[in-house]
Amino acid sequence: MRIGGINHLTFSVSDLEKSIHFYQNVFGAKLLVKGRNLAYFDLNGIWLALNVQQDIPRNDIQHSYTHIAFSVKEEDFDHVVEKLKELGVNILPGRERDERDKRSVYFTDPDGHKFEFHTGTLNDRLSYYKSEMHHMQFFD
């Protein structure tokens, strides 16, 4: 069996209009369709879906490190963080990191889904870990 790339991302939201505004303004997502309880976007070739669900627990996952990270260019990072602040986005305290691990900002959408904008790549991370994390086992 061969699995392809990610097909789509779906998030349960409590307020469709508020969430549409968030994803358009924070991510620059292009709204493709909007129904009573759903919205679909194109996010740089990723199918992003929002589905309204009112009565579900929303706070538990916020306490974990579970998140989705998107790449941003190093030269755009400060501007991206400033834009999040201007939009009133809930920015989370970041974890301490070595500069070789590049830069990140963590934030949530209106329903608490956690995201990260990160300037590094997987190769950056592996290179850093190989030089510093001698307890780790690496595979080809």
From Swiss-Prot:
Top enzyme class: transferase
VOC domain mapped to chain residues: 5-120
Cofactor(s), names only, from the UniProt record: Mg(2+)
Main location group: cytoplasm
EC code(s) of this entry: 2.5.1.-
Keywords: Antibiotic resistance, Cytoplasm, Magnesium, Metal-binding, Transferase
Location(s), subcellular: Cytoplasm
PROSITE patterns listed in its UniProt record: VOC
UniProt-listed GO biological process terms: response to antibiotic
Gene Ontology terms, MF aspect: magnesium ion binding; transferase activity, transferring alkyl or aryl (other than methyl) groups
Residue ranges crossing the lipid bilayer per the database entry: none
Binding of Mg(2+), residues: H8, H67, E116
Its biological purpose: Metallothiol transferase which confers resistance to fosfomycin by catalyzing the addition of a thiol cofactor to fosfomycin. L-cysteine is probably the physiological thiol donor.
Assembly: Homodimer.
Family: Belongs to the fosfomycin resistance protein family. FosB subfamily.
Protein name: Metallothiol transferase FosB
Protein's gene: fosB
